[in-house]
Regions:
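Hydrophobic core positions within HEAT/HEAT-like alpha-solenoid repeats
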Residues: 10, 25, 43, 58, ...
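Alpha-solenoid repeat junctions
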Residues: 28, 32, 61, 65, ...
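Ankyrin-repeat and related helical/solenoid repeat scaffolds used for protein-protein interactions
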Residues: 84, 88-96, 102-113
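Short inter-helical turns and helix N-cap capping residues of alpha-solenoid HEAT/ARM repeat scaffolds
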Residues: 16-17, 49-50, 82-83, 116-117
Length: 136
C-alpha cells in the first residue's frame, strides 16, 4: 500500500468513532505493513476502551508477523482482558506470531506457569495450543 494510504489509516486510528478505529485497525492488519509506526499505533489501540477495537488491533498485530518482545508482551497482557473475544483474539494472534518466531512458545509457556492459579490460565493454554497446532 502507498504511504498515503497507511498515513490515512493511521490517522483514522485516532477517530472518535469506535467503528472507524476498528475498521482502520482491520485494514492495517490486512495491508501487512509492519513498520514501527504502524506497530506502535496498533499497540496503543490494545488499550482502547472499546472491545471491538482491542479485538481488531490484536488480530492486526497477529497478521503483521512482528513478534518483537514488546508485541508479544502486549498480547500476553490481553489474555487477561475482561472480554472473551479480546482474549481469544490475543491467543490467536500469538499463534500467528509463533509461526515466525521460536521465542513465542517459550514466552507463552512461561506466562502460563506464572498464571496457573488465575482464571485466565485457559486463555494462555489456548494461545499455546494455537502455537503448537499451527506451527510449521
Amino acid at each position: 500500500a502507498s504511504p498515503q494510504v497507511v498515513e490515512a489509516l493511521l490517522g483514522l486510528l485516532k477517530d472518535e468513532t469506535e467503528s472507524v478505529r476498528d475498521s482502520a485497525a482491520v485494514a492495517l492488519g490486512k495491508l501487512g505493513n509492519a513498520s514501527p509506526q504502524v506497530v506502535e499505533a496498533l499497540l496503543g489501540l490494545l488499550k482502547d476502551e472499546t472491545e471491538s477495537v482491542r479485538d481488531s488491533a490484536a488480530s492486526a498485530l497477529g497478521n503483521l508477523g512482528n513478534a518483537s518482545p514488546q508485541v508479544v508482551e502486549a498480547l500476553l497482557g490481553l489474555l487477561k482482558d475482561e472480554t472473551d473475544i479480546v482474549r481469544n483474539s490475543a491467543a490467536s494472534a500469538l499463534g500467528n506470531l509463533g509461526k515466525n518466531s521460536s521465542n513465542v512458545i517459550a514466552t507463552v509457556a512461561e506466562w502460563i506457569s506464572q498464571h496457573r492459579d488465575s482464571k485466565y490460565v485457559g486463555d494462555g493454554i489456548n494461545a499455546l495450543w494455537n502455537l503448537v497446532v499451527t506451527e510449521k
